[in-house]
Amino acid sequence: MKRLTALLLAAALALSLAACGPEGKAADTVRYGLSNAWDALMPYNSPSGSNYSRIIYDKIYDRLAYVHADGTLEPRAASSWESADGGTAALFHLDEKAAFHDGTPVTAEHWTDTIALLTDPACPTLGRSAFAVLSGTDDTGAAVPGEALGAEAVDKYTLKLTFKTPTTPEDFLLDKNREYYVLPTHLLEGTAPEDVMELALWDEPVGSGPCKFVSETPGSQLVLEANPDYQLGAPGFDRLVITVIDKSNLLTSLIAGDLDYYAFGGNVSVEDAEVARAAGLEVLEGTVPNSFYELMLNNETIPSAAVRRAIDLALDKEALCLHTAQGLGEPAASDLTPGTGYDSGLTWARNVDGAKALLAEGGYDGRTYTLACTANRSGLAALMQQELAEAGITVTIETVDSATLFAGMADGKYDMAIASHTPGALPLWFTESRFTADNNLFHVKKGRYSRSPMAKATKR
């Protein structure tokens, strides 16, 4: 089994909010690093839907449950749940101690009002597709006029969700829990659905999660404080300072004591592992794939399936793995993580001559494509640029932050962009979450669907 050297810190345990309890000892200020910025503080208005944004939402806002990596569930906003109506509905018994940061109790009505707002076709949310599993919605998650919406407040603290097909509460939570946050709808009264996303409230958000908003320097730093009244107990710190810092500065920042924890991208090279050990940091090796890299393609600016396939064949994924994971990666031939139960057994092989033939077939005219990447992937982008040039494809690189990258893909500004995600229980999560009517990053036109090839490599 291939192995990846990964750097882990004991400080990470202090931020495992699932383990927070009233007996947690305050740790004053915890300094937390991210390699990319969040793109919104409103959880249903994120162009990227990335973990860099979700990690922020999970602290400010609350979800129904915790879903652990092994698929087990623990209460969060809901203290318990059960099936109803022969398996077509689920009852969530909300924690009666839960409250928004302004002191207002969180009720089932807040949940139903949140869902009603976001399924309203007039509301310009980017997260509507998550509600398409509920009865009374169409395939995009928009409420169908004249039909009862599958979100009901049975009583003050009981939320009932009704599904289009029989679904256990556990299956629903495994699939959609990360998409459902309760909003302070009592602060939205009198606001038209089409105006909700523009409210100043989202600049200084009020949630019901374990941390309260203090201040933000957009794209650079976010300061939160512990919520002493959180129903599961206050986090074990007083203040949390989240700073965007380049991945190349990870080790030096940790060693210098400028950071206590670094989320996402905490892997170190084999060479840097010795530096980390020498500084007294514990270095562990893992065998589970922890990064999945994608080259997202704009199907509107690259309309030919032959040209898109040529891009896939022109890339040397072995070289990309060597660059990104010091050879501890594995090329992928599809959206599915190799070696998992969902893997179809497809194999990959580079074929530059085949790519050239497909370019001719697709009528590629030598135009220059724009490839967007974040700073920590600039080396990977340069290698892709070189490999594509060997097949005759001209690419220029634009280095931007994560929020700009995903917004640019959504707006059609870029022809291609490098992204990555952490593989999980849902094998098509990355593609599905960015391929919806409201957030079609691949720009696949209705009625002209063809699978958007994304050059993939997994890192273990």
Where are these regions (language model features)?
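N-terminal lobe/hinge region of extracytoplasmic solute-binding protein
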Residues: G33-D85, V206-G207
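A structural "hinge/loop" feature
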Residues: L34-I55, A77, T104, E170-L183, ...
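Surface-exposed binding/hinge segments that line
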Residues: F131-E189
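Gly/Pro-rich hinge or "lid" segments in bacterial periplasmic/extracellular proteins
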Residues: K176-P235, R239, V352-D353
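Ligand/substrate-recognition segments at binding pockets and active sites
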Residues: P218, A360-P423
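Append "and occasionally in soluble cytosolic enzymes with long acidic Gly/Pro-rich linkers
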Residues: E225, P303-Q386, E390-A391
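Ligand-site clamp/hinge motif
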Residues: N227-D272, T394
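Extracytoplasmic/peripheral linker and loop segments enriched in polar/acidic and small residues
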Residues: R309, C321, D343, T396-L405, ...
